[in-house]
Amino acid sequence: MPATRSISTRAIRIDQPGGPEAMRLIEVPIGEPGPGEIRIRHRACGLNFIDVYHRTGLYPLPLPASLGMEAAGIVEAVGEGVTHLHAGDRAAYASTPPGSYCEARVMPAKCVVKLPDGIDFETGAAMMLKGLTAQYLLKKTLPQEGLKAGDHILFHAAAGGVGLI
């Protein structure tokens, strides 16, 4: 059986809930992607309120925990069965499990999309979770009855991430 290549990356982890001082920069191993997975090297990652809620324990995570829900970067490797992404592709994601506060990671390819050429890494990383939230609010939250093209919709707290899209 061939040996699997192991590389390492730096990542932000917490061992207990707390303020920013709870975050630690550590070295962690990452391997090759398995079937249905990709390895992505981050160029930018998003910061969201849910990340703060995870860090403070408001939304508890099993500890120790990695933080971060969205990022953008370059696909380094793809696992068996992945057809929509290739090594060298620019890509972005918003996904669980948390862990985007790192230089690189292996994750499910089904959660990753190609980043269009006209979108830089910073924008790609910052818009994924907010964009999915806006799409959910528009398409899945009731009531939808009576809405038609041209109607105006008000998002409360528009100074947050969704309001800045």
Task: Label the model's feature ranges.
Residues 12, 38-39, 154:
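Conserved beta-strand elements of the Class I
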Residues 18-23, 49-51:
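Short N-terminal binding/cap micro-motifs at the start of the first secondary-structure element
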Residues 119-127:
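Short pre-catalytic strand/loop immediately N-terminal to key active-site residues, enriched for Gly-Thr
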Residues 95-110:
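A structural motif shared across PLP-dependent enzymes of the aminotransferase-like
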Residues 1-10:
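Basic/polar N-terminal segments that are highly enriched at the extreme N-terminus
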Residues 29-46, 56-99:
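Glycine-rich beta-strand-centered segment in the early N-terminal region that forms part
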Residues 127-165:
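Mid-domain Rossmann-like dinucleotide-binding core that forms the NAD(H)/NADP(H) cofactor-binding site
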